[in-house]
Swiss-Prot record:
Name used for this protein in its record: Uncharacterized glycosyltransferase MJ1178
Family listed: Belongs to the glycosyltransferase group 1 family. Glycosyltransferase 4 subfamily.
Lineage: Archaea, Methanobacteriati, Methanobacteriota, Methanomada group, Methanococci
Alphabetized InterPro entries for the sequence: Glyco_trans_1, Glyco_trans_4-like_N, Glycosyltransferase_grp1
Record keywords, A-Z: Glycosyltransferase, Transferase
Amino acid sequence: MIIMKVLMPSIYYPYIGGITLHVENLVKRLKDIEFHILTYDSYEENEYKNVIIHNVPHLKKFRGISYLINAYKIGKNIIESEGIDLIHSHYAFPQGCVGALLKNKLSIPHILTLHGSDALILKNSIKGRYFFKYATTNSDKIICVSKYIKNQLDENLKNRAIVIYNGVNKEILYNEGDYNFGLFVGAFVPQKGVDILIDAIKDIDFNFKLIGDGKLYKKIENFVVKNNLSHIELLGRKSFDEVASFMRKCSFLVVPSRSEGFGMVAVEGMACSKPVIATRVGGLGEIVIDGYNGLLAEKNNPNDLKEKILELINNEELRKTLGENGKEFSKKFSWEKCVMGVRKVYEELSD
């Protein structure tokens, strides 16, 4: 029985990434709530009966603004025709701005979830700060996926902000052994520090597998080929199930980010009993406890990162100990807890 209807401006399938996985884990566990998802491209293979996907036309060159305009028009019609109870936007721009516009036009409660780079990059950019401010100030509740993200908010917004951590899919995240390779999972963009990782591992006699895609991919691929770095394998974009398979087998996970709102990939690695080497930035400090469940390296420092990687390569017993501690630590993060927190927010705002 459907007890509530939610309009959800968000990234969703066919796009693979943290926000998509977050949204999927919400909708499949909140079966008594009907979700109308406004996304860039329709996903015809939707398997959830409580989910209706609405395709938002957009121009690739002006993706954000064109989505904002068209999602607002489509969202307004859905709210008026379907009797929507509240709006839950994922990411500040353009999705959060769509939710904010609809809230002001139709007087409907608006929840905004900040996932990381919107609070860390958009908020501080010349072009993005206006959109970030509009989305956050026109939200009744702001959900932050880490304490670090909440602390980035202006003081006048913190009273409406709460922290609800993401969960991990424990069904497919477990230890399958140590197959002697280091793993990176993330976008090939400057923020994720993949270029720092390449600099750190180019001379290390150990195998590394890098999963992801992005604007730095071609540059890194050319560097790997030109320098005959056969120990570095670029695997491109993979499905979450494929990523999980590599995580279960790796020796350790490397998260060399320049900025990170939370770093869910680190928790996923820990759920597989893998030690994590991460940079000392943002929300990663809430997850990776140096010497307990992983090792912390200094930001933008390939030499320090290299030292930490070599420390794990040369000490199998340390890998095992850190991995076991990480497994225990990862139990704090469950989708059940996350969904319970989101449901509570929905109930508070729909009363």
